[in-house]
Amino acid sequence: MLRNQSVGNGVSKQASAKAATFSTINSTLAADDMFKRNFVSYLPLNNEDNDILFPSIKTIKFIEMLHGKKEFFKGQSIHSVLRDSAVFKKQMFYTLSHTLLNSISIQQINAEWQRHLKAFPFRSKGMSFQEYFNIWYYAIKQVILEGILQTINYILQNLDNDIYNKYIDWICTIGITPIVTLPKNKVTLTPLAKSISSRLIQEIIRNKQNFLLHILTQISSTSIADFTNINIYRNKSDGNITCLSNNKELEYFVYSAPYFINNQLLFTTPLAHLYSELNKHENLHRHRKMCQLLNTFPIKVLTTSKNSVDNKKILELIEREEKTSDAKKSLIKFLLNLSDSKSKIGITDSIEGFLQDITPSIIDQNKLLISKGNLQRRGQDNNDRDIRDIFKKQIIKCMEEQIQSQLDEIETLKTANRLFENKIKDMHSLINLSETSKHDFTLDSDIESLSLAKALNKVQSLPFTSVSIDDTRAVANSFFSQYIPDIEYADKKIDQLWETEYTRTFRLRKNVNNQGQEDSISYSNYTLELLLIPFMKHVLKLRHFELLPEEFLFLSLKEIMLAVYSNCKIKHYLRLIYIRQINELSHLIHTQKQSDLTLTPDLGSTNPEDFQYPQDDVASKLKRIRNSRHIQYIKRPEYL
């Protein structure tokens, strides 16, 4: 018993070991196969052999500017017009409705008519054949429109509207669109066929099954990569472009190829054309914000000395400092007194005071300044010459001492100045170095998004230099008020640049009202050709489709369906069946008047204006759109 259990346990262990071994081998083989298929993506990117297209500082800036990371302009909204996913949805709706409605054959219409005749035979009592046929005509029309609409909705519910938005973003920034191919799940039309009761619609779906499955497969398995984890580079030797996403190579579509001139990369997209002007405007905005923060600080005061220094003040300071005077101070006092003297008497008083300060013991005041009565006697006095000699000697002595002391002091100050100038230069260099290292270089990028308090703190820490003004100089100009540069003209210029670049690059149409004012901006027939045809052919890989007419952009989906129905061949088939039945059943309606045999306008005419409601409403709307937009379908120029 125990032996059998041990044997059983050994077998189970061997089986589990084999399973683990097989699992390891399969994982290794799968990894090896994946490595072989994606070998190129594992190789390191050599910048010397490749030119980086994306991501780079410049191309990332393209995307930030496109979606207004820092600022958004009025003219920039034209990009939203271009990336309208409703245009792509209407294009797909028009393609499907046009293909399905025109796939109906006259045999199918006749078979429906025969079934109707068999189920509800015509009887001439109380009803004309024309009324009988009209009832079936509008009934079969309603069946066809509802069945086709249900089929189209089943297809379009798998449509990712964001795929067209990403496509527009790529061609406006880089010019290259990376295409992601998703795993192709099995698609089927069986649920759709089961939900439709009309035999005619089921036949249409069955006849166009390959076409519908191809569209359903492509729109469910095709996507456009976003701007994350994408690397796009160009080989310098052969010029081949490679797109990688998470180490996996992607398909791509080149809408606008970049140029390489003098080893420089030149993009040819709208954002590349606007890049330099947008950079200038961004710098202007940053400068404006700095001025706003610096010149609107709560308190900003310019101070100066309130003391007025004149000759009288100097004399008071000298006398207060030291009452005992020496020769230098007496000489300065004498010179200041002379400068204030405006008459002979003032000069005489200045000389008298100077002599009293210098030689009070040897000067006789009566002899120095005598009255006019004693003038004759003073001229004869021998002591006058002695006084003049003493005065002259004292003046010369004071001036020599002053000049010598000034020269000595000047030399000393020059030496000290040279020493301090060197020290100041060294200190300035150290301060500038430390201030530069402390400066937050991220301030330029986030100054617009910071709160006022944080922005003020950051701006005040910038390495600005204060300037001291000497007493002998005056301020010529300064901003002591709120100085903020005006950017109104620059904003208008950028708005016009956005609109002009997009309008002329993609041939957008500006719609105006009766007063000539701009009403809206929309796709033109040129824009549809420039954007939708490459997208349908190269991205979705749909080769057979009908391009959406420009006037259909202003219709709803139901109106598009009615407009397509009014121009398809079903109407002609119905008219043919009506005339044929009139001839076959002429013996039944021989009692009717000849006017009853006349075709009604909605059956006998092929003009859109002849439709009854709601067809006539759609036709008149299309006519009004063509006239108001001046839409003309002419041959597209070769350069486009």
From Swiss-Prot:
The organism of origin for this protein: Human herpesvirus 7 (strain JI) (HHV-7)
Taken from the UniProt entry, a GO cellular component term is:
host cell nucleus
Major localisation: virion
Which domain of life does this protein belong to?
Viruses
- What is this protein for, i.e. what is its function? Forms a portal in the viral capsid through which viral DNA is translocated during DNA packaging. Assembles as a dodecamer at a single fivefold axe of the T=16 icosahedric capsid. Binds to the molecular motor that translocates the viral DNA, termed terminase.
Family note:
Belongs to the herpesviridae portal protein family.
- Give the Pfam families listed for this entry: Herpes_UL6
Q: Which InterPro entries would you find in this protein's record?
A: Herpes_Portal
Protein name per Swiss-Prot or TrEMBL? Portal protein
On assembly, the entry states: Homododecamerizes. Interacts with terminase subunits TRM1 and TRM3.
Instruction: Write out the GO biological process terms.
Output: chromosome organization
The protein's UniProt keywords, in alphabetical order, are:
Host nucleus, Viral genome packaging, Viral release from host cell, Virion
Report the locations given in the UniProt record: Virion; Host nucleus
